[in-house]
Amino acid sequence: VEGDRNSGEVRLAELVDLTERAYAGEPMADPAFAAFQQVIQRHRIPKAHPLEHLAGFRMDVQGYRYQTLDDTLLYCYRVAGVVGLMMARVMGAEAEPTLDRACDLGLAFQLTNIARDIVEDAQIGRVYLPAEWLAEVGIPEDEVALPQHRAALATLAARLVDLAEPYYRSASQGLRDL
């Protein structure tokens, strides 16, 4: 719905502005952003991380279409990988290898979430599976939620879970450092 998209864009612009102001050290009237400002300052969270996270939200608001696996992985990085990076910093991690593993954990979680929620997401107009994958099994993007495609979707969900496994293994290497 166009109105929803416009209101989403307006809200995103507000969040970007509040994020920029928090990083600029401006006094924050919003209690959530005042707390956010304390966290980013205390834990030296790079500004690029929350801005990247908001870019992931923008992909949803704009109805981004995922043509390739790289597109899907970019979304996963933006909505979950950078969350792993920020959380690792809050937990005191600074070493690049540890931060990389935290990012991998976020990617693994998001790939798993996508696999779990394929039909539910499609019912609200969000398809995170690569269009290339859907074409391989003959599912038009606008038919992902239809019951006749469940068997083919199960194979794609399994493929996503398989794709997540190396990220989980990588992440487990960094857990001891958190």
Region spans (language model):
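Active-site/pore-lining binding-face segments in mid-to-C-terminal subdomains
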Residues: 178
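Acidic catalytic motifs of isoprenoid enzymes
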Residues: 1-175
